[in-house]
Design a protein with these regions (language model features):
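Aromatic (Trp/Tyr) and acidic
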Residues: 34-37
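Acidic/polar-rich alpha-helix caps and helix-coil junctions
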Residues: 1-20, 40-199
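Residue-level signal for threonine
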Residues: 27-32, 47
Length: 199
């Protein structure tokens, strides 16, 4: 963690397993695209997030990334303010940004090194290689882990596109609940669908 920041927020409650807040949760369909997704590491059980999730399928599983800290202003009355601590900058996200820069320089070996460093801390027993990335994101990846891209710049088909899809997948996992996905959505023209619970 390079920079932590605090905020008065009920965000942890809004993304929890509460029926009234399920609109803002992370339902199982989205979990299968992020924290429970297959990838170059193999199946979802290889990701180190697998055993940190809890909750029900109906209201969404909870990944306790932003935990609430409650500060009592009056203990007798039981009132106070909810706080969260967020990580504004992490070395993990920085590695993925640098890997993306290497991809656009066509320095795939250095991109693989950064992706390997990320996988070392996020996935069990993963060995990353150019061929593994090209094989998975070139043919095995599904619409859950590989989105249609419509950028206003050129991405070469083949190896460069496969590496970009890999980075976007890893960044989506790394930055869940941080709002940084919107930068990727805008840059790459990824279509977003907002599903309403029960409709």
């Amino acid at each position: 963690n390079l920079l932590l920041q605090t905020a008065v927020s009920a965000y942890a409650r809004m993304t929890g397993v509460y029926k009234s807040y399920r609109r803002y949760g992370h339902p199982i369909a989205k979990m299968l695209e992020t924290l429970l997704s297959a990838g170059i590491w193999g199946n979802e059980r290889s990701l180190k997030y697998f055993d940190k999730l809890f909750g029900t399928q109906e209201y969404g599983l909870v990944f306790p990334k932003l935990i609430e800290y409650f500060e009592y202003t009056d203990k007798v009355a039981g009132i106070g303010q909810a706080h969260i601590v967020t990580t504004a900058f992490t070395t993990d996200e920085l590695l993925l940004c640098r890997a993306e820069a290497f991809i656009y320089q066509k320095d795939y070996d250095r991109a693989v090194a950064d992706i390997q460093a990320w996988c070392d801390t996020h996935a069990s027993g993963t060995t990353v290689s150019r061929s593994a990335i090209n094989q998975y994101y070139g043919s095995q990846a599904t619409e859950r882990t590989k989105k249609d891209l419509h950028p206003k710049f050129v991405i070469e088909n083949g190896e460069q596109l496969n590496f970009v899809n890999c980075i976007l997948h890893l960044r989506r996992i790394e930055t869940v609940h941080e709002g940084l996905r919107w930068f990727d959505i805008k840059r790459y023209g990824i279509e977003v669908t907002h599903n309403i619970s029960g409709g």
